[in-house]
Design a protein with these regions (language model features):
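C-terminal non-catalytic interaction/localization modules
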Residues: 1-62, 69-77, 88, 104-129, ...
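Glycine-rich, N-terminal phosphate-binding loop of Rossmann-like dinucleotide-binding domains
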Residues: 100-101
Length: 238
């Protein structure tokens, strides 16, 4: 088996709607079944979960989030999971993988990058890659052809991510698709001057952790609650 691409440690956060294959994508990246996945429209990830694996000298952390892009999720649930995501991916993720299923592109996904910028900050898209799942459904079409022939909304999503996208066939046990994704992530990280994503939420959590403090309520909670309302409004927009 080819060696996992070596480099600095990597923190990955998976984001997407319920049922698009986030958990399966996490398992594909890690090369083993760490997250429970099921081909269902019901969420099998109830809370943010993290798995860490060492490949040679490289430590890779993957955070699987519940379907925060589902408009049916309550503001309270989203707040709780964003806090949890920040805590377990501190000091900040190198990449947000926006997971979208081939052949399925919903209203919420059309607005997803803009909504996530509202939630995490305007610079979040500089650290974002679109990861398409169910690549086998493409048939003889390449993912580049799929995006090119797709709707203007799909093109806009990839454009907002500076045309960074990749495709997985989660039933494919070969590691080539994973190594190619890691290569794209590494190039993006290099373009970001090797910096991970951070904002006031990550900075506050990291500062508390360095001081050994157990925080009951972070200062960023109040503004986060307001951003979640705007996030919901953007997602639901036609």
């Amino acid at each position: 088996m080819a060696l996992f691409p070596q480099g600095p440690d990597l923190r990955i956060v998976l984001i997407g709607k319920t049922g698009v294959g986030k958990s399966a994508a996490g398992n594909t990246i890690l090369g083993e079944k760490c997250f429970f996945s099921s081909p269902s429209s019901e969420s099998v990830t109830e809370s943010c979960k993290q798995h860490v694996k060492k490949f040679g000298n490289r430590v890779v952390s993957v955070v699987d989030t519940p379907g925060i892009l589902d408009t049916g999720k309550s503001a309270e649930m989203i707040k709780k999971e964003i806090v949890r995501c920040v805590e377990i991916s501190c000091p900040g993720p190198h990449v947000f993988l926006l997971v979208i299923q081939v052949g399925r592109f919903t209203k919420e996904e059309k607005n997803s990058v803009e909504a996530l910028q509202e939630l995490f900050g305007p610079q979040a898209n500089n650290h974002m890659i679109v990861l398409f799942t169910r690549g086998g459904d493409l048939g003889d079409m390449t993912i580049e052809q799929y995006v090119h022939k797709g709707s203007k909304e799909l093109k806009e999503i990839t454009k907002r991510c500076e045309n960074r996208f990749h495709v997985f066939e989660n039933t494919n046990r070969g590691r080539k698709q994973v190594h190619e994704l890691i290569g794209k992530i590494d190039r993006m990280v290099a373009e970001n001057t090797h910096m991970y994503y951070t904002d006031e939420m990550f900075q506050e959590v990291e500062a508390a952790r360095k001081m050994g403090m157990r925080v009951i309520k972070y200062k960023f909670i109040a503004p986060l609650q307001k951003r979640i309302l705007r996030f919901h409004s953007i997602l639901a927009r036609d």
